[in-house]
Amino acid sequence: MEVLKLNRDYSGSLRRASGVLKRGELVVYPTDTLYALGGNALNEKAALKVYEAKKRSLSKPLPIAVSDLRMMEKYAYLDRDAKTLADKYLPGALTLILEKKNLPALLTSDLDKVAVRIPANSAALELVRLVGGPVITTSANFTGEPPPVSIAEVPRELGAEIALDQGNLGERVPSTIVDFTGEPRIVREGKIKADEILSAVG
């Protein structure tokens, strides 16, 4: 795994990483919450590599990162409440579970829904823009292990070709997950508190 430090001008590193993703290989990249293991979300072989690398059950869908609401609406259906939350908190530590469209079955474990987010991290957003489509965003660890907040905590055995190093990301607080495939339901409380979510969609 080649580690590329994201210094002041990291455009070249992002271009290299986007090229790796377009080839169907894996990249470790920073988000606003943790280091993620990424693959091209539209490439089933890349999704399978992520499952195998993390030792993750194929019955557990993989979340995706998009660069903006326009890209989100290309791959998922946003109802009024979901749009309200997205407008208020994204980019940010919020993951929305939405009915999917135009995504491979393997990525979503044959389910009709997908977990999608827009991370508040400029490097992550630019990486997704350079790829031109959604990027898998799952913690860069083995399933069941603590999520990494530094590159030193990322197992080399994950098989990522490149790791983008932005230093220590700080506290291990995950994104808040809200399911909009039925009545809005908080699946996991993270950085954004449940009462904030409920007041926004109530």
Task: Mark where each language-model region is.
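Active-site-adjacent structural elements in enzyme catalytic cores
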Residues: M1-G202
